[in-house]
Amino acid sequence: MNILTDPLKLKTSGCADANASKCAEGDGEGSVQVQLDPNVKIGSAKVFSIYGKGGIGKSTTSSNLSVAFSKLGKRVLQIGCDPKHDSTFTLTKRLIPTVIDVLEEVNFHSEELRPEDFVFEGYNGVMCLEAGGPPAGTGCGGYVVGQTVKLLKEHHLLEDTDVVIFDVLGDVVCGGFAAPLQHSERAMIVAANDFDSIFAANRIAAAIQAKSKNYGVRLAGIIANRSRETDQIDKFGAATGIQRVAHLPDLDVIRKSRLKKMTLFEMDHTDEILAVQQEYLRLATEMWEAKTPPVQGKPLKDRDIFDLLGFD
């Protein structure tokens, strides 16, 4: 059975076939909403999506959070949802083939694939997958995400998984790259203590709340990353009710871990590293035990964000 249609052949006028994820009508400018097929849901695993401004450190955060869950004894699957397919390289020490790569090799006949063709074991047993995506300017990345989940279910790879982490492309909040929210119970936003990333976080929060009207996903809060201080993030939180759930400081050793293709849990155990490891373990524990309650906050209008942030 061929469960994935070539994304380059997708049209905005409708789905590729009757079994594909449903597509809403276009908005007149070529945009479509990719909606979850009710028959394709992740099972009993806890599912989290990580969003944030491009380059803010989502992949570093996601990978170290995945390891933290694995250190708690959980079976973890990390799914990279970016055509750059670099979400998992600190876990696997290489750029692994994407789902799109391997499907192209078999002319999109998914029944010819084996699990080891597209799922790879990384550090401390974290299972890694890169969804990939169509070339720039073509197809729909959200469709690829939805069909990746279908492929995982087809091979029964979600049955022995406790935690799934979606690491999602930049600050794109279109219907396509919002697709992981349809599978998630909690979404977190990675932001630094600066205007641009908080501005992006505000827009992402609005997208998450829009999805929460039809799906079970709820915003859990903001992970402050690459930031010595958190005063601007906390000011934003006070104005919106969107709380900060973790603080990961701006340390050179974190940058070096990416260059060494390592997670922070593999680096030399300095006091700095141990403190950051403990912060990841604390956050993973709270996420697992559902101690990160859903945010009932209200994102601000763009002009209000502009007026709010900055020094008096």
UniProtKB/Swiss-Prot annotation:
Chain positions recorded as ATP binding sites: G55, I56, G57, K58, S59, T60, K84, N225, R226, P249, D250, L251
Any GO BP: photosynthesis, dark reaction
Residue stretches in coiled coil: none
Pfam families according to UniProt: Fer4_NifH
EC number from the UniProt entry: 1.3.7.7
Keyword Signal in annotation: no
Domain of life: Bacteria
Listed CDD domains: Bchl-like
Residues that hold Mg(2+) according to the record: S59
Keywords: 4Fe-4S, ATP-binding, Bacteriochlorophyll biosynthesis, Chlorophyll biosynthesis, Iron, Iron-sulfur, Magnesium, Metal-binding, Nucleotide-binding, Oxidoreductase, Photosynthesis
Disulfide bonds: none
Molecular function GO terms recorded: 4 iron, 4 sulfur cluster binding; ATP binding; metal ion binding; oxidoreductase activity, acting on iron-sulfur proteins as donors; oxidoreductase activity, acting on the CH-CH group of donors, iron-sulfur protein as acceptor
UniProt remark on cofactor binding: Binds 1 [4Fe-4S] cluster per dimer.
Pathway: Porphyrin-containing compound metabolism; bacteriochlorophyll biosynthesis (light-independent)
Keyword Nucleotidyltransferase in record: no
Catalysed transformations (reactions): chlorophyllide a + oxidized 2[4Fe-4S]-[ferredoxin] + 2 ADP + 2 phosphate = protochlorophyllide a + reduced 2[4Fe-4S]-[ferredoxin] + 2 ATP + 2 H2O
Cofactor(s) annotated in UniProt: [4Fe-4S] cluster
Binding-site positions, [4Fe-4S] cluster: C140, C174
Family: Belongs to the NifH/BchL/ChlL family.
PANTHER family in the cross-refs: LIGHT-INDEPENDENT PROTOCHLOROPHYLLIDE REDUCTASE IRON-SULFUR ATP-BINDING PROTEIN
Function: Component of the dark-operative protochlorophyllide reductase (DPOR) that uses Mg-ATP and reduced ferredoxin to reduce ring D of protochlorophyllide (Pchlide) to form chlorophyllide a (Chlide). This reaction is light-independent. The L component serves as a unique electron donor to the NB-component of the complex, and binds Mg-ATP.
Family annotation (NCBIfam families): DPOR_bchL
Subunit structure: Homodimer. Protochlorophyllide reductase is composed of three subunits; BchL, BchN and BchB.
UniProt protein name: Light-independent protochlorophyllide reductase iron-sulfur ATP-binding protein
Species of origin: Rhodopseudomonas palustris (strain HaA2)
Gene: bchL
